[in-house]
């Protein structure tokens, strides 16, 4: 399991790069490649002038996550997405809703997406993602 850069096995350098790739995959997953408003999600329409980028400890993002997560905690996630960053209690309620309810609270929340992004970054950098995904 060596990269094209010569890192083999579980060396410190290999662990560093796989950690960085994991971070990149997480950021890509949470920002949706900067597509914060998906107009095809008509059940969770975007409010005019609102931005649905990553906020809070779980980095909730995109209108299709803010709507259900807001409903799960009794907040208008679509109409006031900034509240996640402005209100500490709602911030952590949102995180708990994701941790406890996952896919039930927020359809589309998928570890498979993050794994897919991780594999894409590994491929682009010539690094073996390893067998434990």
UniProtKB/Swiss-Prot annotation:
EC class, as a word, reads hydrolase
Q: Which GO terms describe its biological process?
A: cell wall macromolecule catabolic process; chitin catabolic process; polysaccharide catabolic process
User: Catalyses which reaction?
Assistant: Random endo-hydrolysis of N-acetyl-beta-D-glucosaminide (1->4)-beta-linkages in chitin and chitodextrins
Keyword check for Hydrolase, yes or no: yes
User: Per the database entry, which stretches of residues form a coiled coil?
Assistant: none
Family to which the UniProt record says this protein belongs: Belongs to the glycosyl hydrolase 19 family. Chitinase class I subfamily.
Biological function: This protein functions both as an alpha-amylase inhibitor and as a chitinase.
Please identify the protein, giving its name as recorded: Alpha-amylase inhibitor/endochitinase
Q: Which organism is it from?
A: Coix lacryma-jobi
Q: What is the lineage of its organism?
A: Eukaryota, Viridiplantae, Streptophyta, Embryophyta, Tracheophyta
